[in-house]
Amino acid sequence: MLYLKYKRYIMDSIDSRGLLDLVKYPIITDKTTKLLEENQYCFAVDPKATKINIKAAIQYIFNVQVTGVNTCHPPKKKRSIGRFVGKRPHYKKAIVTLASEDSINLFPET
C-alpha cells in the first residue's frame, strides 16, 4: 500500500513539458508488429528515461492507460564505411503494454 502511494506521488509530480522529448519514435519491425496483437507497442526512448517517466509520457502523448513498461539497452552494432569502422549510436528500447480497451494508431489511413 505504501509503494502504491509513493508511485502515485511520483506520477503526479512529473512535469509534462519534458515528456514529449522522452519518446523519440516507434520501432516497427516484424517482431514488433507481432507484439501489436498482444497490445504491446515498442518505442525508442531517451537512454536516461526511467520506466515511470516513459509510462507518464505515453499516457500524456497518446491518452491511453499503460499497464506495464519493459526496457532494454540493445548492444551497439558495428558499421563500416569504406575502411573505417564505427558503431551506431546508443539507444534505449521500451516495450509498453496497454490496457485491453486502449490502442495506438501507428499506421494512419490515407
UniProtKB/Swiss-Prot annotation:
GO molecular function: rRNA binding; structural constituent of ribosome
Cross-referenced InterPro entries: Nucleotide-bd_a/b_plait_sf, Ribosomal_uL23-like, Ribosomal_uL23/eL15/eS24_sf, Ribosomal_uL23_CS
Pfam families: Ribosomal_L23
GO cellular component: chloroplast; ribonucleoprotein complex; ribosome
One biological process term in Gene Ontology: translation
Family: Belongs to the universal ribosomal protein uL23 family.
Name listed for the protein in its UniProt record: Large ribosomal subunit protein uL23c
Species: Pyropia yezoensis (Susabi-nori)
Gene that this polypeptide is encoded by: rpl23
